[in-house]
């Protein structure tokens, strides 16, 4: 939030007139986000739950960006990513962890019963939409959900699909549920489709294969260097 404030202040002082992309999060919709639209009510989550600190900070950033946009006529565009994955993803993302463990034949651990539902968006589709946010003048002043509502699957189903697609013998192990988890997270991307012409192209299985290849290639480079 402080970082967002600093960036906005600098943009104001420099008179930025091209485009300012403010990255928010789908977490602002809380623990139940079914086909959430940009104008739907956002939530702050329960005070004291560490998970929601991130969502609250991002939501505060959204409000601040909107205020700067109106007050100083800054070309703000807010995006809310929904479960983006693919090459370059941080090592603590569920899909990344599942693929790495499947490639190694290690147990895949799931928090809770695995019935949590997610919609997975491949990074190339995500970047395409960001580029539209940068270049399309109609995007200025708007917020957009970016995700793939066609790639919907439970966490258990995701683990099973990864094992099948990668021909892995990994076992799925269930762990105690997290104290604060999101039961369902599926975006509505109708606004991005209408305004930006956005449509995700990479289905889940293709995305899994592309991500797995990237991981394997990275491992090969590491082995060569070592």
Model-derived features with residue positions:
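Amphipathic terminal alpha-helices
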Residues: 190, 204-226
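Conserved SDR Rossmann-fold cofactor-binding beta-strand/turn motif
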Residues: 24-25, 80-85
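Catalytic helix-loop patch of NAD(P)-dependent Rossmann-fold dehydrogenases
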Residues: 1-9, 13, 18-19, 27-78, ...
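C-terminal "lid/loop" region of Rossmann-like NAD(P)-dependent oxidoreductases
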Residues: 113-115, 141-145, 153-159, 167-184, ...
